[in-house]
C-alpha cells in the first residue's frame, strides 16, 4: 500500500462524535500525522465559516499551507480563505430546485458562503439547528438576488416526510444536479459533478499528490464518491450500507469510539 500523504475527513458521523466533539486521542493522532508531513483535509458539506472552531482545534486555521474542501467539493480553499477552485449555482438553478421543493411541500434554503437565505415556505426548515454559526436571512423567493452566487441548497426536514418527498423528485433533476442525503434530516442539492471526489481531485493536482496516497474517511451518501475514489477508502462502522460497500476498509468501531484515530494509527502513522 502506498504511503498516505493526505487524509480526507468527513466531519459529522466520522471525525466528530455524536455530540460534535473531537476527542483528545483523535486530535493527538491527527497532530502526529501532520508532524509526519501528511496533509489533513476536512472535507465537508459545510461552508468554511462553520468550520472555524474545528480548524482551530486542529491548529490549521489561517495557515497558507493547509486546506479545506467545503460545500461537498464545490469550494476548494486554503485555510486562509484563498480559493483554489469554485463551482456554484446560478439563480436559474435555485429557481428550478425551488419549484420542485414547493411541489413536494418541503422547505429549501439557498446558501452563499456563510449566509443562508431561508426561503419563506409553509414548511419550516430545520437547517439552523445544524449550523447555528451561520448567518440566517429569512427571504421571500422573489427577493433572492440574481447577482449572488449560491454554493448549494439544502432541505432540512423531519426524516419520514423528507424520505417520502425524495421518492417523488423528478428524474430529470438527478440529471441536472447532485442530490443526496448527508444526514437523516438533511437533503443537499449541489451543481452537477460537484462532490467530494472532484474537490479532492482538484486539490491533489494542485499539491502534486497521487490519489493512491489519499485516505478518505466517511459515513454518509455524500462521502461515497471520495471513499470510492481514494487509494484507501475507509467507512465508519456506523456508515450507510452503500458507503461500506465501496470502502476498502470498514472500521470495527463507530465515530463515537474514535474510528478515525484507529484508522490513522493503523494505516498512516509509522514507527520512528
Segment roles from a protein language model:
Residues 2-6, 23, 188-272:
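Mg2+-dependent phosphoryl-transfer enzymes with acidic/Ser/Thr/Gly-rich catalytic loops
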Residues 3-19:
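Asp-based phosphoryl-transfer active-site loop
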Residues 24-124:
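Active-site phosphate-binding/coordination module
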Residues 33, 72, 153, 227, ...:
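Residue-level signal for inorganic ion chemistry
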Residues 37-41, 65-66, 152, 212-213, ...:
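Short active-site oxyanion
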Residues 41, 69, 109, 180, ...:
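Structural detector of well-ordered beta-strand residues that form the stable sheet scaffold
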Residues 58, 64, 72, 173-175, ...:
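Short, structured coil segments at secondary-structure junctions
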Residues 100, 104-217:
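Conserved acidic, metal-coordinating active-site core of Asp-based
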Amino acid at each position: 500500500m502506498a504511503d498516505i500523504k493526505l487524509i480526507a475527513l468527513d466531519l459529522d458521523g466520522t471525525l466528530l462524535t455524536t455530540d460534535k466533539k473531537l476527542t483528545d486521542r483523535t486530535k493527538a493522532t491527527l497532530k502526529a500525522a501532520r508532524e509526519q508531513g501528511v496533509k489533513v483535509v476536512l472535507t465537508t458539506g459545510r461552508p468554511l465559516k462553520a468550520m472555524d472552531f474545528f480548524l482551530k482545534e486542529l491548529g490549521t486555521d489561517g495557515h497558507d499551507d493547509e486546506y479545506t474542501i467545503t460545500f461537498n467539493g464545490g469550494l476548494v480553499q486554503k485555510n486562509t480563505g484563498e480559493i483554489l477552485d469554485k463551482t456554484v449555482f446560478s439563480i436559474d438553478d435555485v429557481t428550478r430546485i425551488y419549484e420542485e421543493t414547493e411541489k413536494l411541500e418541503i422547505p429549501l434554503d439557498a446558501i452563499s458562503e456563510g449566509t443562508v437565505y431561508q426561503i419563506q415556505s409553509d414548511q419550516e426548515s430545520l437547517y439552523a439547528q445544524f449550523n447555528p454559526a451561520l448567518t440566517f436571512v429569512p427571504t421571500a423567493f422573489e427577493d433572492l438576488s440574481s447577482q449572488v452566487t449560491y454554493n448549494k441548497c439544502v432541505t432540512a426536514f423531519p426524516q419520514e416526510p423528507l424520505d417520502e418527498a425524495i421518492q417523488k423528485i423528478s428524474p430529470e433533476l438527478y440529471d441536472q444536479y447532485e442530490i443526496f442525503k448527508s444526514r437523516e434530516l438533511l437533503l443537499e442539492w449541489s451543481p452537477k459533478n460537484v462532490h467530494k471526489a472532484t474537490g479532492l481531485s482538484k486539490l491533489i493536482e494542485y499539491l502534486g499528490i497521487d490519489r493512491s496516497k489519499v485516505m478518505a474517511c466517511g459515513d454518509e451518501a455524500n462521502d461515497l464518491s471520495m471513499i470510492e475514489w481514494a487509494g484507501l477508502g475507509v467507512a465508519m462502522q456506523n456508515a450507510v450500507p452503500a458507503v461500506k460497500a465501496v470502502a476498502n476498509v470498514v472500521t470495527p468501531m463507530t465515530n463515537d469510539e474514535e474510528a478515525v484515530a484507529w484508522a490513522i494509527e493503523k494505516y498512516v502513522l509509522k514507527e520512528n
